[in-house]
Amino acid sequence: MVALQRLDDYLTDYQYFFKNKTKKFFDKAEKYSKGIFLSRERNIERICESHHDTEYYRMQHFISDSNWDARGVIDKSAIGTSHALPKQKLAGLIIDETGTVKKGDKSVGVGWQYCGNAGKTANSQVAVMACLSNGDFASMVDARLYLPQGWCSDKKRCDEAKIPDENRVFKTKAELAFEMVQHQLQLGVEFDFVGADGLYGNDVELADKLDGLGCLYMLDVHRDQPIFLEKPQWHVPPKKGNAGRKPQIEKPNQPSLRVDEYCKALDKEDWEEIKVRNTAKGKLKGMYHFCPVFILNKTRRSFKKRLLVIRKTKTKKGEEVKYSFTNANLAQYTEKALAYMQAQRFFVEHCIKESKSVLGMDQFQTRKWQAWQHQVALNIMISGFLLKEKLLCFNDLPLLSAADIREWLCFKMLQTRTDEEMIELMFFRHLRRQQDINRYYKTDELINVSK
């Protein structure tokens, strides 16, 4: 029962946030959290069914209407994750968005928008998420619901979803990402760099704002991102021919170049191979190229010097190329450190997948603003517990997954097998997992991918 006791102790440490001036809600928080592990479908009705003594309407009220401190829960989890992560490598605050396909038009923030989970435009709910990572360990630390412009300008919908007045202002995903970075800094969460995909990397204003905060960043960019190899000067171009008016608008005195065009022009000797880290599918390695470039902020009409990082990796479909900008330079960081930072975006995707497949983040069926905030807060809180369990058990169980922890807790709560049967089941599962890993390495020696 040791793991269950650790879960109880962990949850008890959060009980201060589950109350208001007249009521305490910790018993509901505890049952909901354990129900996430017990129930196959993680909506309120199924979670209540996993606890036979829990009334559905009281749990519904706890999630949708009670005024406990969801932000306090998220912030405590973020600080706990910051303290728990090993300080072995550069810590990254990695940002990504995630979408969940929805039916109907009542769920808060739902709309016809691009949904990464579906890989297309769909009727969906989208959130911007942040995870904290160091080495091979990571956990979610923040989340902001994205409200499309149509929602912010529709008072009736906002009233029905009970969205607070201060949150009825349209913010882009990049603006939500910047708010999260600012908030983590204010909390004292420790991270060495900010990472994100091309949606955020192509937002030059976000990069400038991060620069203004003194944050190191490694942001992916799209292949059509324009760059300048030398710092341009502003000038009014000369008039061409006799027809037309004389040019009056200043432009850069040299043409820009797309990053993919620049990449195609590189020679073989312009690349170097870097082995980044061990993974479950062999060593993560690639051919890397680094080049100082200048990028244009059209809004501020300014040029900023950045380091372009390009990685080429072989895949089953051929070759994959990844482009990133960073405000780091090679005098501060080694090529391997920069390659490591670029590769860390994997972990926010993994955390989101874990939050959905193991903790049911994509199974919310509530409609109100506060309900979404409450369920995400509970989800992030449990993510912090999973991280601590992985770290605690690492020396004995380096391949322990969130799904393993969930299954073990379910087993202890339901006690459908003996301890010996459950340990044997997990042993053979990890043995098969290790055998799959070893197939990707040439050597016969067992390799611990988490080290």
Question: How should these model regions be labeled?
Answer:
Residues 386-416:
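Conserved nucleotidyltransferase catalytic core and NTase-mimicking acidic/glycine-rich helix/loop elements
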Residues 36-40, 51, 63-66, 328, ...:
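Generic structural signal for hydrophobic core residues of well-folded globular domains
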Residues 136-162, 222, 227-347, 411-414, ...:
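An anionic, glycine-rich sequence signature occurring as long contiguous blocks
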Residues 18, 333-342, 357-373, 393-394:
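Short, solvent-exposed helix-loop connector elements
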Residues 420-451:
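Long, charge-rich low-complexity segments
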Residues 349, 381:
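Hydrophobic, well-ordered secondary-structure elements that form the walls
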Residues 1-195, 199-229, 233, 240-259, ...:
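Conserved, well-structured functional cores that handle cations and Mg-NTP chemistry
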Residues 68, 103, 158-161, 406-431:
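Charged/polar, low-hydrophobicity segments characteristic of intrinsically disordered regions
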